[in-house]
Amino acid sequence: EDYNSIKEYYQMRRPETADSNILDLYIWLNCYPTWYFTNDKGLMWVAKSEDGQYYSSIPCCKDEDLKECFLETQKYFNEVLQKKLVMYVVDKAAVDLLQLPEDEYVVVPDRTYADYVYDAEKLRTFSGKKYHKKKNHLNAFKREYEGRYEFKFLSKKDEPEILDFLEDWKKHKSDTEEHEFIDSEAVGIKYILEHEEVFDYKIGAVYVDNKLEAFTIGNYESREDMVYIPVEKANPEIRGLYPYICSQFLIEAFPEAGKENREDDMGLEGLRKSKLSYNPIYMVEKYTIIQK
């Protein structure tokens, strides 16, 4: 119900972070208790982690109002919550705009949440030496499953199949914490599927032998000429399926897009290795701000 009003605030500033993507917000909104407040300049976030720590993220407002909205967030933390301000995933442009005094704040880069940005055309074609291995895996998939695979777009009506796939996909993960993470993600995916008429996104899927084996969700922001990919899942036992859905989704859904943001690696070694293997053209740095 708040989507349209929140979307207006999200359009005021467009840093290239996944966190500035409203689709990403709604997929992960149920992870922790989260609320917001507004004034005539912007929207300010407050969230509470499992261990009871309060934190915020960069306000949604125009550049010229950022300092005012930042201080409004700090005031809420100090006066209402009786806490020092902690703000995560702050983009570099915001840090530069805020010009925070060193004697009052600690500002530190956080590699864990840096986003990976790619040349979209390279991901469509996997051309060049750097993508030789990806191209080999992709071709192996096409050879192995020739005549047996199909790319499709999915929608709300496919929700049961998508949720069943996520349950199966979870079996490949042994970590209990990761299971909770996947369950939370599934709740968010269910929400955007059930409200597809208000969200602007596309879901691509790959079927092998008429069975759903991979799906991905993405949306496009014209101001950055950027596709954002908050979700991509594939059966890890099918060689070349991940490169195939990555490439084919861009070809079918966003053929003209210049860049793709594939989000952060959450500090997970395996995920970092995977994201680096797609050869990002740059990283979107993010910072943590802590009030002293």
Feature annotation, model-predicted:
Residues 108-116, 281-292:
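Conserved catalytic-core motifs of GNAT/GCN5-like acyltransferases
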Residues 102-176:
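Acyltransferase donor/substrate-recognition loop-hinge adjacent to the catalytic core
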Residues 94-108, 136, 267-283:
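Conserved active-site alpha-helix within GNAT-family acetyltransferase domains
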Residues 18-93, 98, 207-238:
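Conserved donor-binding loop and adjoining core beta-sheet/short helix segment
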Residues 200-290:
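Aromatic (often tryptophan-rich) hydrophobic motifs at membrane interfaces
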Residues 86-87, 150-152, 259-262:
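Short catalytic-loop micro-motif centered on adjacent basic/acidic residues
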Residues 157, 161-211:
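Short, conserved active-site entrance elements at the starts or edges of catalytic domains
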Residues 1-28:
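Generic N-terminal amphipathic/basic segments
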